[in-house]
Amino acid sequence: MSEELQREKESQKTRVGRNVLVTLATQLVSWALTFAVTLFLPRYVGDTGLGNLAFADSFVVIFGVFVPLGTSTVLVREIARDQSRAGNLLATALLLRLPLGLVMGGLAVGAAALLHYSALVQLLVLVAASGMVVASLNDALASTLQGQENLTRQSAAVLVEKFLFSGLTIFLIFSRAPLWALASVTLLTGTVSLAVNASAFRRLLPGLRLPSLAEVRTLVIAGTPFMGWIVFRTLYSRTDPIILRLVTSAATVGWYAAASRLVGTSLFLPAAITTALLPALSRLHGTDSAAFRQLVRRMLGIVMMCGIPIALVLMLVPGQLIALLHYPPSFQHSIPVLRVGGLAVLLYYAAMVLGTAVVASDGQNKMVRASMIATLVSIPACFAGAYFGEVYWKNGATGAILSDAAVEAYLVFSYLRMLPAGTLIGENLVFLGRCTAAALPMAAFLELMSRSRTGVWILLPCAAIYGIMCLILRCISTQDIAMVRQILAKRA
């Protein structure tokens, strides 16, 4: 029996590692495709056009955040613990989201008209609202696949969507398409991704039945704590473009959006790892607390080891990044935003990992309070940051992202306090110290070379320097290397 248990544990470790690699590979390809759009879109639409796109997207997100009612995490966690419930939970989630999505989308369109936004912005809101309904349904399918740990199919849908999105967007840019056509690409590619994910559930269809109102109510109640956390978290993170437009101008929103896109592309790593490990963490929390703590530590260590050099690049050579992308001169205003964004990257990375660990350990009720405080503080802080940034620096976007970084630091501190006792230990601080020490030679080289007229090619020797220092200081575990080799050998 003990041998069977040991084999089962080894199988789970291999599955977890495989899921991490599959998701990470998917996110790497997605990053490259997203970067291609980031390369061309600001050049074509300019700061004002990019600001209008970002504003419409954030405006609709404020309404769309209420559609899932916090059920996405419920689907992942409950299905990971009992996969026989997948069909019933998925049907209930879809029945809940479709009417809510239509209602909230209609409210977003109506609100844009009542607020007398320009005809262009109203059209962009209509397109974004339609895409929001599709995305909400697709999210239910993706969450179910994540709970089943079927990340291969979920990754296939993501890749199809990203390939289509990047290809169509770039084609429309070179075709000189209007702004609303560019916004419509998200709706089209989201529909294709929905179809790909839905094809994974063909065998479940014969057994599906219409959920009862009691089942819908049970799912809503289970999602309520997550809904509070997600709603407050979204309001905190997505209101900046709206506030900036109120305080400054569409061009300033564009500077902020350009920097946010570059910072956002760096978040593929924690997104990949937390997506892959949430089901395993949810399962381990109820069955093996020691393994749960160990997995959280390794997850945080890997993410922060990769986040430190990315943060340094954004802080030290943002001008070279803007020059590489050949953005119009007006986007020079994004450089100070990127410098602050580099510091914020470390906080974003830590918050994503710690938040995932708290959710897996059933601590979502505690997260609601922290997210509520963050929202109540962040909105006036963003107003103040945007206003004073505009007055003193002629750049409200810098003040806005400074307020974001401050609130993110509060969330990281809050999540640390919510973790089960003994999850993180002094060894984690020592590891972060080693990673920081490994990054110092890279930072010195980067700072030295950035003073001369060098291109972004300097990132290649920087990566080599950091990698060598990580090996010397033992930031990379031999256990991790062995696991990767084992997974790759089995796949071969």
In which residue ranges do the predicted regions lie?
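Interhelical loop/hinge segments that connect adjacent transmembrane helices in multipass membrane
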Residues: 1-12, 16, 152, 179-180, ...
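Specific pore-lining/lateral-gate transmembrane helices of multi-pass inner-membrane transport
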Residues: 78-96, 255-372
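Alpha-helical transmembrane segments of multi-pass membrane transporters/permeases
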Residues: 17-30, 87, 126, 130, ...
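Membrane-interface helix-loop junctions in multi-pass transport and translocation proteins
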Residues: 40-50, 122, 148-152, 163-195, ...
